[in-house]
Amino acid sequence: DMGLSDLGCYGGEIATPNLDRLAQNGLRFTRLYNNNMCTVTRAALLTGTYHTIAFRNQAINPRCATLAETLHAAGYATRMSGKWHLANIGERNQWPIQRGFEEYYGTIYGASSFFAPASLKRNNADASKDFEKPGYYYTDAISDNAAAMIAKAHKDKPLFMYVAYTSPHWPLHALEEDVAKYKGKYAKGWDTLRA
């Protein structure tokens, strides 16, 4: 869901220091293809196929194996935390657990409240009780659950951990301290960023 220009390392105006450090010490892409929608991009990423092959009828093409299915068959532990948005809510056969992930925390829907996300699941079970806890924020919950999955993973088995944040996606719900940090930044409009 994040665009290339959203990251500080590619010229974005929002501070992304941790991602910038990863980019500084890792591999940065300079030639890439992006689809105009988050769902088809996600389907292509998880199947390694062109989006018109990977995504059919609001779900991953059943004839395409996901990265999780392939890696699980090769002996990897497979975990996911975050936004799925590759199936309709009633199509459980297309949910993360059914598409190769052994453990999952996140939303089936693509966009929802960051404070009370619709379709929140832990594996295939409803997890809406999670956001009844004071201070719940979906972005933090995605990170916390991913960290917990990594911490309890077997050290002698390779791990595929897929994390899909909703934070750069509509609706844009930020914590008050994050809003305050950028107060006035866009008071003159977006055109000042293009200058």
Regions found by a protein language model. Give the residues of each.
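Formylglycine-dependent sulfatase
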Residues: D1-A195
